[in-house]
Amino acid sequence: MENSFKAALKAGRPQIGLWLGLSSSYSAELLAGAGFDWLLIDGEHAPNNVQTVLTQLQAIAPYPSQPVVRPSWNDPVQIKQLLDVGTQTLLVPMVQNADEAREAVRATRYPPAGIRGVGSALARASRWNRIPDYLQKANDQMCVLVQIETREAMKNLPQILDVEGVDGVFIGPADLSADMGYAGNPQHPEVQAAIEQAIVQIREAGKAPGILIANEQLAKRYLELGALFVAVGVDTTLLARAAEALAARFGAQATAVKPGVY
């Protein structure tokens, strides 16, 4: 039950990831063999629930890629359910301050360190109580990544970084750029300056900085600055653009849509 993703971050080894939004265990397994260090199962913006997260965790399990799960909100009940089906690494969205970061950490810990309910007899995480001393070992293997996506969160970053149990801080470029008045343009110089400053600040505090960016040049820049978990693409985008390119080679034209951030 060792969390190798958490161990890699602690050791300072950069981890390259891919975002999963297709909500499919079949495509999750396909991508688990592609060579990425981690795969993000998105419960915030993709149509996932606990059951679909479970099947994707099962599909990814035989492969080296490590799953990271994003719940729809910083909700202790939802987090409890995700942990029970086997999630060890969480990316908690829209964390605004230290209190909210502390709540996220407490939701992943059994008492007295936290508030996670004990249901190990029903839980895949404990292999239905077949893992010896699961209740004693589980807390140490939880990896909590909090997501900062607003100017308010950026202002509170020093206090968030002081929260014990926060392993990493993920910068959400799409929401941050929108909050800064540059919706759809995370490459705006002011947004980029804020992102770069945050990456350096997070790393200097001994935490792991993370981000999602499909621009290869920017991804490499963030890695140079010290980012440790960087998602470099999204499965839905890869599929859509590849399909459009194939159709275009035979004279077809995709339905006109406004380009997205990723």
From Swiss-Prot:
GO function term, MF aspect, one: metal ion binding
Pfam families per record: HpcH_HpaI (PF03328)
Catalytic activity: 4-hydroxy-2-oxoheptanedioate = succinate semialdehyde + pyruvate
GO cellular component, one term: cytoplasm
Top-level enzyme category: lyase
Textual note on the cofactor: Binds 1 divalent metal cation per subunit.
GO BP: 4-hydroxyphenylacetate catabolic process; phenylacetate catabolic process
UniProt binding sites for a divalent metal cation: E149, D175
Active site positions, chain numbering: H45
SUPFAM superfamilies documented for this protein: Phosphoenolpyruvate/pyruvate domain
rRNA processing in keyword set: no
Keywords assigned by UniProt, alphabetized: Aromatic hydrocarbons catabolism, Lyase, Metal-binding
Swiss-Prot/TrEMBL cofactor(s): a divalent metal cation
Disulphide bridges, residue numbers: none
Subunit structure: Homohexamer; trimer of dimers.
Family: Belongs to the HpcH/HpaI aldolase family.
Listed HAMAP family: HKHD_aldolase (MF_01292)
Official protein name in the record: 4-hydroxy-2-oxo-heptane-1,7-dioate aldolase
Name of encoding gene: hpcH
